[in-house]
Curated annotation (Swiss-Prot):
Record GO biological process: glutamyl-tRNA aminoacylation
Predominant location: cytoplasm
InterPro entries, A to Z: aa-tRNA-synth_I_cd-bd, aa-tRNA-synth_I_codon-bd_sub2, aa-tRNA-synth_I_CS, aa_tRNA-synth_I_cd-bd_sf, Glu-tRNA-ligase_bac/mito, Glu/Gln-tRNA-synth, Glu/Gln-tRNA-synth_Ib_cat-dom, GluQ/Sye
Recorded superkingdom: Bacteria
Enzyme class, UniProt record, top EC level: ligase
Keyword Nucleotide-binding listed: yes
PROSITE patterns reported for this sequence: AA_TRNA_LIGASE_I
Subunit structure: Monomer.
Tagged with keyword Lipid biosynthesis: no
Catalytic activity of the protein: tRNA(Glu) + L-glutamate + ATP = L-glutamyl-tRNA(Glu) + AMP + diphosphate
Gene symbol of the encoding locus: gltX2
Name of the protein this chain belongs to: Glutamate--tRNA ligase 2
GO cellular component: cytosol
Amino acid sequence: MSAASEKPVVTRFAPSPTGYLHIGGARTALFNWLFARGRKGTFLLRIEDTDRERSTPEATDAILRGLTWLGLDWDGEVVSQFARKDRHAEVAREMLARGAAYKCFSTQDEIEAFREAARAEGRSTLFRSPWREADPSTHPDAPYVIRMKAPRTGETVIADRVQGTVRFQNETLDDMVVLRSDGTPTYMLAVVVDDHDMGVTHVIRGDDHLNNAARQTMVYEAMGWEVPIWAHIPLIHGPDGKKLSKRHGALGVEEYQAMGYPAAGMRNYLTRLGWAHGDDEFFTSEQAMAWFDLEGIGRSPARLDFKKLENVCGQHIAVMDDAAAMHEIQAYLAAARKPALTDLQAGRLSAALYALKDRAKTFPELLEKARFALESRPIAADDAAAKALDAVSRGILRELTPILQTASWSKQELEAALTAFAGEKGMGFGKLAGPLRAALAGRTVTPSVFDMMLVIGRDETIARLEDAAAA
């Protein structure tokens, strides 16, 4: 067991603020969050904003919003990588002092000429700096970069908790630049310095970074620092097995909020996307924290499956606390740039949730089924509802209205009164329910007639029946 595995767990999510929070990045953040939270560890957030041309405050805000919506809370302040550039440069100079790095005065033109000659001669284009072993007394007064003095023989071995043992032949790795000629650090150095200084014990990230692990291990070893535990997770592919792209649908996390998926459902689905705990498909965040481990992560890319996502989200909506559901619905409306609920609508919707939550897989679907509670009179009938409100049906509704004016307003009493009325008319209750649904909701497929009547109340029920009867 490595020393890192014996320490309190510290994980991190380190996105670049060049766009929205990608769903793949969100899953990486989630895996780090679950691993830390399940072990009473620390989950840190670092914004890797060293690329000043592409990094934007708007992208940083979008990342923070996406993580917040998913419920992935981080510990401490958000760390800016750019703000730590002086520390990175300090480490580069320390590597120089240790003999683990050297000043390279080769110009870009010289490097390109070296590569062109290598290509022409069929040799490796891996740049071998002539300054690696040069005596400092021969150094010119000219701009230089600092390169790491990578070993040229042997191999660098990565013991990865997902990918297994991965070996890199050192002769295939060049002396990477750690500090540019303008004094700014490279990404490869900054990542290692930040992870070390932040006390990161486990680096859980996409397997597109696996090759970086070899170079970064060399930096750790050059500085005499403990190497963290690596876990490189496979990427997410589209349903067709190809790399996820816009043609597969939404890529940004905020798009999923705007489409009305519940955060708990997204967490559940993303956790299951590439990780397994037996045959369990539905689980709470508490269960996921307790169960999540690196050994359960598969090596093959996971495929995005929107049908599974909807099914899982539907299960979460069904068991959601009413207050939490109302909060998320309001947030969904804001994210989708739709009008907020009025106090009357919110009150009715809250009262109707018990009859709706197990009938919807997304919030738009739930709100569609809640139209009866949200719309104002007169209720517009769709084609099927208009057909159900023929002359005979309108007459029946007129006769029913006085009975409802005196009925006790409870589900049991309403059921008894309407069943008795249908019996007197020589019809089954189903024949009566059709016109009632059409009058109350303007639809023929609705929640229970009794649930709708209880939610909107006696006065609104009678008013809607009178509107329909008079049409």
